[in-house]
Structure formats: C-alpha cells, structure tokens
A protein has these predicted regions:
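Extended, histidine- and acidic-residue-enriched regions that form the cofactor-binding/catalytic faces
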Residues: 1-110, 118-230
Length: 230
C-alpha cells in the first residue's frame, strides 16, 4: 500500500476504498517561527509526522494513507510578522468540510485530521460538530502533540513557559527533521511569564483564555526556550 494518496491513480483509489483505510489528513499553518525557524514549520512537521505514522502503521499491517497536507491555517495573531499567510476561520472551516466531503464521496470515510497548529484547534472542534450535525459525517481530530504529552514532559529541559511557540519542542523537532535549516545563531529565548490562570505552556492549559497578538507577547516571535532544544 502506498503512503501518499497523491501517488494513487483514480483507478487505484477505487480499489483502495474497498480496503477501508484510515485517511490521515494533515493540517498545518504558514507563519513566523522566530528568527531561527522557517515559515513552513507547522505544515512541514505535521506532514512528516503523518507520513511517518502511516509508514509505521503499514509495518503493523494497519491500512492507512496520508492525504495532501492543508498547508495554511488560522494565524491572524502572527500577521504582524512578515511572511505569515492566514486564512479566515470560515474559509478554513469550509475548506476542510469540502475536502472531507470529497473523501467521503470516494468512499474514504475513516478520516483523522491531524493538526499541527494551536490556532486551528477551536476551528477543528467546530468542523467536527458541523460535519456530524449538518452532514451526518463522523471524523476524528487531534493535534500531534496530544499523543506524546507524557514523553514531552519527560524529555523537556525547560521550566514551565518554555514550550509554546518556536520553542524547545518545535526547535528540537526541526533539529531532528531538517537540522540544516535551523539558524542556531539566531535562537532567542522568551519564556512566557503571566498569570497562572492563563495558559503559558503546552503542558499547562490555563483556566482563562485571553486573545493576544504575538507582537504583544514577543518582539521576535518566540514564546519559550528554544536554546534548550537538542
């Protein structure tokens, strides 16, 4: 079984549907990640993780295929930094619904949307509700880090506030996936320090949500401690 749906012909997709595979749909973003990481981080990493996950599933005789990555997402909070490309929440909602409906029409119905950007999470929850109640289509959604929270906590070196954006975790993943593109000499730390009632870290969701642009929180686009990444 081929890993990427894009490598199938239409005849092969008809045969693929008979196998009832899991379709992994990666969802990323195209936005600033500090001075040391490229704009592609979210869409690049989630796509790599999806491909590797499907590859490992094949080793266990689990039928799964990766759909083409949705490379941009909801990132208005990063628009003060050059290069960010954001789409409206309703645009992203409709785009995902259209893609899911297309897959379902092709009898590819076991769909997991794998997210790689925090700004997409609320939209994904809404998409799942709309598909269920408006279209009677069931999907699963998750962010890749949700599968590894314990492991992230075990290997992290930073204190609370060190894993957020362009942080220890994302920098470590990019060092593993494409080290030559990381500008190590440009790394700057900026651990978030604010009320404990608001979330300051991937592993510490706060009780209170407060919207803010990244420019208000960081002069260079980093929230966290990327210098500790290995």
């Amino acid at each position: 079984m081929k890993i990427n749906l894009s490598n199938y012909t239409w005849e092969e997709v008809k045969d693929l549907a008979d196998l009832d595979p899991v379709i992994l749909l990666p969802l990323g973003a195209f936005e600033q990640h500090g001075k040391h990481l490229p704009l592609k981080v979210d869409e690049f990493m989630v796509n790599k993780i999806a491909i590797e996950s499907v590859n490992k599933s094949h080793d266990k005789n689990i039928k799964a295929v990766v759909a083409p990555v949705i490379w941009t997402g909801y990132s208005p909070h990063h628009m003060d930094f050059a290069g960010t490309i954001s789409i409206k929440d309703e645009t992203l909602t409709n785009l995902i619904i259209d893609i899911v409906e297309s897959l379902v029409k092709n009898k590819l119905e076991r769909i997991l949307i794998l997210n790689g950007h925090g700004g997409n999470i609320a939209i994904l929850k809404n998409v799942g509700q709309k598909l269920k109640y408006d279209k009677n289509i069931y999907i699963a959604t998750s962010s890749y880090w949700d599968f590894a929270m314990k492991e992230i906590n075990d290997w992290r070196k930073s204190e609370l506030g060190g894993i957020n954006h362009a942080c220890e975790m994302e920098t470590a993943l990019m060092l593993h996936m494409e080290e030559n593109i990381v500008k190590k000499n440009k790394i700057e730390d900026n651990p978030l320090k604010r009320s404990p009632y608001t979330g300051v870290d991937l592993l510490s969701g706060g009780a209170v949500g407060v919207s803010a642009s990244f420019k208000e929180l960081s002069p260079h686009g980093v929230i966290g401690s990327p210098s500790l990444a290995t």
